[in-house]
Amino acid sequence: MGKRRGILTDDPQPVNVGGAFLARVAVLTLLLMALAPAARAVPTRGDLPILVILAGFPDRPLAHDRAYFQTLVGRLVAYYTEVSSGRLRIVPHLGGPVVTLPEARARYVQRPAVLARDAALAFSAAAVDPDDVRALRESQGLIVFFAGPGRESHVEGGDPNDPWSNFTMLEQPVGAIHDACVIAEEEIPPLSPFGVLAHEFGHLLGLPELYAPGAATHEGIGVWGLMGQGTWLGHGDQPPHLDAWSKKLLGWVDVETIDHTTTGVTLPTVTRAPRVVQIPASSDTPQEYYLLENRLREGADAKLPGDGLLIWHVDERVNGFRTAEQNPAHKLLHLVEADGRGDLDRGHAAGGNRGDATDPWQGPPAWRRRLGAVSGLLGALGLAAAVLRLARAPAVIPVLLRVAAGAALLAVAGVLRHGPVCGPDTPGMAPYGGGPVRAVIRNLSPAGPEMRFDVLVAPGGESLPGKSP
């Protein structure tokens, strides 16, 4: 890890909290609990006041100064302002006292709720500044930065005494705070703690894990969203946007529902407009549908592996904080991969991956469309010439050759101009409960700031062909 820097001398002195002192703190805490409002969900729109506490251990002090944490928190505010399209405004208060927790760091491994509680109690005992006291009373969420790296960045090695970064809920609220994130101040280089901070804060807002749990070999939603493996994009320093479903759940996107055939649908990128398209997957199950979003490598999405239309197969009947992506055959969120390879569900061991450039859907580029138009014109001219030749002289063989050449050019033109079709023939589109695939997405434009496509929707109980006519 290299040499660590200590807390700068102009920072407040660390507050050591022993057992006897915690007993006195309990009286203050009980009073704060009595004054606390009833438990309620953290708001996902408007202002969200957050208290940030810096906490060291008796056997390991913090290695970074206050400016370091101010930068991390500032980036968190900017990130969620972007991905929520300004609908959520995090209002952080970086607390004055830097506290020292009462137990050694090894005692907090797999005990995030205890770590958060101890940090909040120590802070409440040390807070004398009116702004700190007010933040403790009014904040609706808590972030505790603890000393040292997080276990998540060295699962298969490193120091087993490093606690995990985690989201947790306090058994008893402290002030108005019920939910907390405990975050390592750093990760093992070259990894950054920012992606982990953003991910765990997503849990505080109510989002589930969207990667496969435990020892599962598949990848859930992969790198295509913050709550999946996107946490680690750019070595954890540049996590992507949340996926379309997560934004829908939080109220951060406008949903355009298309339940009948519609041509010329336009969809800007998620970095430019908060819009997604929803298409019913089953006439009998409203909880099952497709969500479409336009992703481009810009803004927070700069490190994505590719650009284009992401088509999500959603089934909200599958739920669970840690189990939503557990079963690769039936997940809350399934990415309908444009390449049809199912790499996310196969996992690395079977030759899969966490997402690649051929997962998003996109139409042919402009040069292919132009070449297709030229091929179509040449094919039509060839057929016309063959007809004229046949009218003048019944030489069958040359005429047939001209007809074949013209037909081939027309076929090439069709392939070049029309591009891929997502429909009944596409892996991952079939409704989980059986029944026909009722939606086809075709005639896609190239990936770009605004994509255009057609949506064909069959009446209930009927299906549509998966290939372009």
Task: Explain the meaning of each model-derived region.
Residues 398-413:
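Internal/C-terminal transmembrane anchor helices
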Residues 370-391:
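Selective detector of the "anchor" transmembrane alpha-helix that sits immediately C-terminal
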Residues 25-34:
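Bacterial N-terminal signal peptides
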Residues 129-142, 469:
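Acidic, glycine-anchored loop motifs typical of Ca2+
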Residues 42-70:
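Fold-level signature of zinc-dependent metallopeptidase catalytic domains
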Residues 270-366, 411-466:
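Extracellular low-complexity, Gly/Ser/Thr-rich intrinsically disordered linkers
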Residues 86-87, 136, 140-304, 315-319:
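Extracellular hydrolytic enzyme modules, especially secreted metalloproteases
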